[in-house]
Amino acid sequence: MEFTELFKLIYENDIDTLEKARSEGVDFCKTDVYDQNNLLIAYAGSGYDKRYQPEDLIDFLLHCGIDINHKRNKRGGELAALHVAVSKMNYRIVSHLIENGAEIDIREINGNTPLWIAVMNYRGQENMIQIINLLVSKGASLDLINYHDRSVKDIINTIGGGIDAGHNKKEWDLRHLLK
């Protein structure tokens, strides 16, 4: 069974059907040929919850042997499931990935961590500030420098300077994290 067929199976079926497929030898650890995306990363970007809870499907995939910290190849930006869930602002998936051992400061192709992505994309959204607070409470670093010599603190201070100058909205201010 190919990757796209597996992803369709995940989208269309319930856990019982997925368990049956696994017992019949279906390999859920496959990746797509283009960017080495795995089913956990693909699911983290979509977060379907029509037939089952996201936590149930993540647990199923992890029990199938999927590496929670698997990253896409360079073509895919070396993103892990945690990066993708953060960028999609899906708190439930972010939280469950962290609870199950996702590396909190995993880096993508530019050296950016999930917290860096969250801060960079934050524009006052309630679910994103919850993700930022969760990442910080779980030990995500504000000080790690990416491959372009920028840290989360740098981004927070740059946005804060824009707020002080009247260029950015006040609700974007995250400088309270630096205290």
Where are the model-predicted features located?
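Ankyrin-repeat-protein effector appendages
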Residues: 1-5, 129-133, 137-143, 147-179
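Ankyrin-repeat boundary/"N-cap" motif
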Residues: 2-6, 31-47, 71-84, 107-120, ...
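Ankyrin repeat A-helix N-terminal signature
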Residues: 8-13, 42-53, 84-90, 117-128, ...
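Terminal domain-start segments
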Residues: 16-33, 37-45, 64
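Ankyrin repeat domain, specifically the short helix-to-loop turn at the C-terminus of the second helix
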Residues: 19-27, 57-68, 95-103, 131-141, ...
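Alpha-solenoid repeat scaffolds
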Residues: 28, 50, 68, 104, ...
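Alpha-helical adaptor scaffolds
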Residues: 67-75, 79, 83-105
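Conserved binding-pocket/active-site segment within a compact domain
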Residues: 107-123, 127-134, 138-141
